[in-house]
Structures are given as C-alpha cells and as structure tokens.
C-alpha cells in the first residue's frame, strides 16, 4: 500500500532547524540540483532531513560511508517513519574474498564469500519497495553503485496474482521456478514454496515474517492471504499480490540462452587474439574455464561467477555502465549523502580498485574482457544518475561546495543548547600520564572517554598500558566486523567499559552522549588523520555532553589545528549568542540505548521464519573465578554449545559461544 510520509516524533523543529528545513524544501521545489547541509554534531541533521522528506513527499535514498553509520541511520529513520517503507541496502557479504591472480607468484585465488541471508532479504525488500510504492526511504552504503539486475527484467519477471484470476497450478509452479524459487515440502523457508492439493504456499524472498497462501479451485484463484509460516495463522486477506524474483540477478531462459550465444562469440574472438600473441597457456585456460561455465548456464541456468557475464545477460554494450540501485530510483527522487566529505571520495575510488584486479584476470586468461563490465559505476556515471541531492556533513569538502554553487544551509545551533567542546592544547611529552589523570576524572563523573592515536601499534600499546593501570578499556580497529563494532559502541554507552581507543574509527556518526572527553594524541602530526576535517569531526564526538571537552596533545599548532580550532570557536560563539538570546541552559543529550539494527546482535529479538525469539542470558561474574574454575566452566559450556548445535538450536549455541569468549577474556585478564 502506498501512502504519504508521516513523521512521528515527540518534538518539533527548533534552533536552526525550521529555517534549514524551509530553505532545503524551497530549493528542492525550485529545481536546485545540489545543496549542502552543514550541520555540527548533535544539531539534528537526521531529524532535519526527516522533516524535508515529509514535506517533499518523494522517494529518498540516503547514502552513508559505512555499515555502522548506515545501521544507525536506518534505526533513526525507522523510528521517524514507522508507517512508511524504510529499507536497508548494504553489501550482503559477511565475508568476501574476490577472485584474483598474482602473476609474480603464479597464484590464483578463487572467489570465496559468505552471504548474510537477513541482509539479502532487506536488499530485496528495498528494491521491491522502490518499484511498488512512493513512500519509501532507503538507507544504503556505496554498495548502491555496484551492479544489480536490471529493473526492467526484475519487473517483467514478477508474478502478479489477483483474486478470481484464472491460472493453472502447473503454470503457477512453472512461473515460481522461473523466479528461482525452490520447492520444499518439508520446511517453508524464505525463497521457497510448497504445494498441498490446490493450495500453494510461497515465502517471498523479500518478506521478513509473512508467507503467501494461494488457494485455487478449478484453475481460479479463490483466496489470497498472508499467514505466519510458523503457526499457520492467517494475518490478513488480500485482493492482489506481486511475487518478485528470489534474486536481483534472475533472468528468463530465453535471455540466458541468448547470452550463451554471445559469450561463445566473444570467446572465439578473444581466443584468436591470445593465439595471435602466442599466449597459448592463457588461451587454453580461458577456453576450458569458459566452456565449463557455458555448459552450466545451458543446463541449469547459472554458474559460479555468473556476475562476470552480466553484460551479456543484461544485453548491454561493451563499456556501458551496469544497472545499479540508482536505476530503481524514480527521476524525481531525493538523494541524501551523509558524511559527504567521506562518502564522495569513497564513491570515486571504487571503480579504480575493481578495474586493476580484473584487468589482470583478463590478461592472463582467467576471464573474458566482458568481465570488466561487471563493475561499480565510475564517478562521472554516478553523477549523471544522481537525482537532486543534499550533501550532509559537519565538514563538507571542496567538491560539495563547488557543486552546490553556494547553496549552503548551516545547522550550528543544537536544540539542547549544547555548545561545541572547549579545546585545550597540552604537551606531547607527558601525554600518556596526563591522559590517565583526565580519564580518572571523567570516570568519577560517570562519563566515557574516546582516545584517538595515529598508528595501530600505538593504539594496542596504549590499550595494554591503560588496562594495566586498572582502566576498563577497549580497542576499536578495522578488523572488527560490523556487528561487533555496533556491540562495542553499545557496551561503551552501557558502561561496561569507560575508554574506547581507535585510529580512524572515532569520527563520523558515532552517536555517544555519554562521552565527555575526546583525547587526540600527536595532534600536530600533519596528515589525513590530523587534517582540519578529521580534527573537527573527532572533536565533535564530545559535543553531546554538557561537560564536553577535547584535548589536543601537540608541541606546535599546525595549520590544520589552527583551522579546526578557529572553526570550532566560530561555532561556539554563535551557539553561545543563541542560548543567551533565548534563555537556554545547555543540557546533555539523553538517548535510550537500543540496538540500531534489529537482528544484529545475539541477546536481542531475532526474527526468522515468522517468529520472534528472545535469547535470555543470566549475567555472570567471571572475574571472581580462578584459572582452574574458568577452565572447568569453559569445558561445561562447550559441551552445552555443541549439544545446542546438534539440536539445531543455533541461537542458544551462539549465546553460549559468547559466554565462552567472555570466560576466555577473563582468564587472560
């Protein structure tokens, strides 16, 4: 059902927000293509954008620089628009090792990946919403510029069912298999269907909790209803329903066979080229690999690495950009680029890295040249496809200022009256000892501390040293996966530890009101980690606390430091003036600590196959156990974990796995 965006919130725009919303909406309706929303941390940028979305009533794509921030934005927009389609579109790989060849050592690395089915379902839900309704907001990462199935094919393949429609059961089953649904009479899982007499049950690939029941009588659809696959209970009756393909890459049998013919033509042409260059090994390798893929496609309709033939399957010309999520957007949509100073360069970098790897594969006979067209968009191609846009950042880059041609809307005043953190400069020589005393002072007040270092080694050494001093500390580094990163941030807010150390991970979008001190070590070392925008962003992490401070440990004031300090002081001055004029007393942000992405954590409600299950855990004080007791407890828990796994109780097994990990940490500590 398509409706209007309805913003649900217990507060109304205040401070700079009303003027910013009005200006953004007016410019959008005036046809201004690019705008900049320059908003300080805690000024309500997300809420401001939500108000803009409600007023313009257009499908919206919000791009974020990483999965952590995308998850946070998804949670916030979901709360603002509970009655509308708020969707999540990020890479569905939990693990991804791309296909690669290293000529120096003659090493070929096969593609290896692990797909997160929950995120795949959310991606399918996002594209279905974009094609079927107008009140849709999709939160995405740079995954949005990577190749996807063509929307025309996706739409043409869908199965539209209406009450009273004439359709034979055999015809219905054939159509479902064309959509790549599998028949499963034992367990109705997402992307499958079952047949019981004249009743066909389908669990749509994009559905989170509800399956479709199609009741036929004498070749006619007598009843359509959504039901709970676990209990069988009917949720609601329907007049009409569209079943979309199980995957974005589904295509018709005719298109697949046509692609096989064009791939054969390309293979013949490229083999002649390789033989002409006397590359006999490469030619033999390519012929063998491609022939195997062609046989698989002809027999079963797909093969491993079928995405490398996407140009043939979509009918695109050589060099033509692949279809992406942007092709699913209507022309009048709104694009919001959050933390644009990071996201914009990221978009520009994707194509080059992908290209160099694939050129090696093509040169040495592992892939046909058409594999080069299975790629992300080039930056200029992305620009052409982008609808009217709003760049959102506390520190917009030169590109954003140039593109917006002066249309910069500022959000400097916070609704809470909070002013930007006070900045202190302290000497490097005593930075660690001084940091310890500052941390202890914050802990006494019940506050948290963020510390940013220049190198991984320094972060590790500092974490180890502070831990030895009795400080509860964690280290956030690039090897930690998305879900665990979300959990670490949540644990910091909950007070399970007091200090978080990082390198380049403490900047954009980490919303932690409990943090009152940000310490930047070696602030006078010029570089991208200590650039003006990096410093402003890092300092801003303490801006949600009334006691917010930033300490820059430096022996000299660099140009970047001076620019960051001057800009922060300009904002502080404007904020103080506004507070004085309106009689506002600053107060810290109070935000409930909740999971920003449902199903992201163990220990929260995990939705699967139409049921909500809560995994409860009894808190345990592992610190009170000695080494022998810890070893014995771990042995008992491991036996329980394996038993749960044998009984297919994987959520309980995962919970115990986490308990074992905490025991192991307690034993090492």
Curated annotation (Swiss-Prot):
Domain Helicase C-terminal: 431-597
Function: The UvrABC repair system catalyzes the recognition and processing of DNA lesions. A damage recognition complex composed of 2 UvrA and 2 UvrB subunits scans DNA for abnormalities. Upon binding of the UvrA(2)B(2) complex to a putative damaged site, the DNA wraps around one UvrB monomer. DNA wrap is dependent on ATP binding by UvrB and probably causes local melting of the DNA helix, facilitating insertion of UvrB beta-hairpin between the DNA strands. Then UvrB probes one DNA strand for the presence of a lesion.
Subunit composition and interactions: Forms a heterotetramer with UvrA during the search for lesions. Interacts with UvrC in an incision complex.
Family recorded in the similarity comment: Belongs to the UvrB family.
Any one GO molecular-function label of the UniProt entry: ATP hydrolysis activity
Gene Ontology CC terms: cytoplasm; excinuclease repair complex
Protease keyword on record: no
Source lineage: Bacteria, Pseudomonadati, Pseudomonadota, Gammaproteobacteria, Lysobacterales
Keyword Nucleotide-binding: yes
Domain remarks in the Swiss-Prot or TrEMBL record: The beta-hairpin motif is involved in DNA binding.
Domain UVR: residue ranges: 631-666
Pfam family membership, one: ResIII
Protein name stated in the entry: UvrABC system protein B
GO terms, biological process: nucleotide-excision repair; SOS response
Domain Helicase ATP-binding as annotated: residue spans: 26-183
Subcellular location: Cytoplasm
Sequence motif Beta-hairpin, residues: 92-115
Keywords from the named record: ATP-binding, Cytoplasm, DNA damage, DNA excision, DNA repair, Excision nuclease, Helicase, Hydrolase, Nucleotide-binding, SOS response
Residues reported in the UniProt entry to bind ATP: 39-46
Cysteines engaged in disulfide bonds, as pairs: none
């Amino acid at each position: 059902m398509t409706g209007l965006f309805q913003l649900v919130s217990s507060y109304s725009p205040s401070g700079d927000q009303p003027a910013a919303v009005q200006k953004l909406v007016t410019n959008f309706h005036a046809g201004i293509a690019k705008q900049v929303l320059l908003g300080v941390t805690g000024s309500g940028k997300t809420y401001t954008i939500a108000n803009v979305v409600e007023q313009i009533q257009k499908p919206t794509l919000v791009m974020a620089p990483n999965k952590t921030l995308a998850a946070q934005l998804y949670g916030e927009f979901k709360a603002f628009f509970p009655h509308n389609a708020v969707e999540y579109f990020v890479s569905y790989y939990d693990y991804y090792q791309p296909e690669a060849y290293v000529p120096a050592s003659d090493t070929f690395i096969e593609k290896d990946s692990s797909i997160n089915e929950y995120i795949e379902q959310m991606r399918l839900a996002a594209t279905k919403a974009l094609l079927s309704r107008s009140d849709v907001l999709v939160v995405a990462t740079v995954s949005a510029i990577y190749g996807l199935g063509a929307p025309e094919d996706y739409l043409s393949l869908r199965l539209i069912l209406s009450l009273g429609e004439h359709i034979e059961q055999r015809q219905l089953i054939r159509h479902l298999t064309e959509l790549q649904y599998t028949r499963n009479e034992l367990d109705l899982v997402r992307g499958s269907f079952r047949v019981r007499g004249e009743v066909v049950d389908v669990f749509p690939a994009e559905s989170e909790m509800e399956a479709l029941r199609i009741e036929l009588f004498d070749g006619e659809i007598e009843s359509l209803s959504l039901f709970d696959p676990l209990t069988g209970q009917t949720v609601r009756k329907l007049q009409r329903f569209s079943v979309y393909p199980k995957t974005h890459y589904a295509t018709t049998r005719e298109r697949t066979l046509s692609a096989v013919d064009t791939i054969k033509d390309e293979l013949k042409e490229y083999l002649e080229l390789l033989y002409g260059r006397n590359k006999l090994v490469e030619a033999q390798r390519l012929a063998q690999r491609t022939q195997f893929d062609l046989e698989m496609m002809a027999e079963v309709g797909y093969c491993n690495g079928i995405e490398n033939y996407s140009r043939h399957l979509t009918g695109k010309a050589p060099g033509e950009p692949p279809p992406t999520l942007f092709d699913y957007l209507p022309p009048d949509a709104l694009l919001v680029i959050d933390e644009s100073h990071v996201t914009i360069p990221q978009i520009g970098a994707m194509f080059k890295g992908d290209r160099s790897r694939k050129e090696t594969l093509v040169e040495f006979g592992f892939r046909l040249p058409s594999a080069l067209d299975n790629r992300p968009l080039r930056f200029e191609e992305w620009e052409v496809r982008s609808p009217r846009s709003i760049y959102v950042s506390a520190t917009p880059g030169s590109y954003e200022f140039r593109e917006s041609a002066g249309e910069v809307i500022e959000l400097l005043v916070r609704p809470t009256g909070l002013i930007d953190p006070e900045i202190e400069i302290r000497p490097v020589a005593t930075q660690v000892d001084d940091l310890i005393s500052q941390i202890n002072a914050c802990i006494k007040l019940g506050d948290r501390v963020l510390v940013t270092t220049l190198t991984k080694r320094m972060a590790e050494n500092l974490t180890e040293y502070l831990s030895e001093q009795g400080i509860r500390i964690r280290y956030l580094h690039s090897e930690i996966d998305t879900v665990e990163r979300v959990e670490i941030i949540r644990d910091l807010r909950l007070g399970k530890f007091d200090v978080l150390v990082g390198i380049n991970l403490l900047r954009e979008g980490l919303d932690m009101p409990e943090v009152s001190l940000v310490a930047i070590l070696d602030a006078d070392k010029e570089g991208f980690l200590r650039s003006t925008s990096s410093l402003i962003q890092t300092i801003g992490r303490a801006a949600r606390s009334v006691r917010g401070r930033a300490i820059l440990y430096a022996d000299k004031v660099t140009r970047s430091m001076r620019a960051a300090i001057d800009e922060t002081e300009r904002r502080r001055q404007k904020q103080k003036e506004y507070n004085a004029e309106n009689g506002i007393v600053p107060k810290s942000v109070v935000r409930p600590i909740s999971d920003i992405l449902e199903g992201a954590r163990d220990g929260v409600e995990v939705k699967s196959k139409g049921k909500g299950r809560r995994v409860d855990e009894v808190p345990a004080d592992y610190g009170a156990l000695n080494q022998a007791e810890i070893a014995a407890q771990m042995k008992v828990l491991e036996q329980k974990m394996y038993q749960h796994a044998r009984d297919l109780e994987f959520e309980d097994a995962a919970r115990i796995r986490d308990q074992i990990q905490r025991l192991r940490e307690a034993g090492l500590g």
